[in-house]
Amino acid sequence: MTVYTCSPDLASILTCIYEAWNSRLGYRNVRLMTEPVGNLELFCDYCHVEPDTEKAASVTRSIQKKIGAAAWRLVYLCAMSERSDAPDIIYRFLLYGFSYGKDTLLS
């Protein structure tokens, strides 16, 4: 399991999501969390991600184009929460969202 860690700000979280997606390890093999990391787990590789505005902008554009503005609003609100697992929640929501497209929030 690879755990991607980042600062608890929007650009860092979006960059972390970009790196996890780009790693091609698969959703079962990655987890994302904000720092500071509490208890380290055995058999996990921890990878700190520095914020990158271009990567964050790429994720933002993809969300708005492929899923929609309402999805972007939910991602933003989740990123602003104080939960350490917010990046992981957003990552898994986006996996679902990119699969279903603009119909993700319908029903």
Where is each model-derived feature located?
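N-terminal ordered "arm"
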Residues: 1-54
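Charged, alpha-helical interface segments at or near domain boundaries
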Residues: 41-107
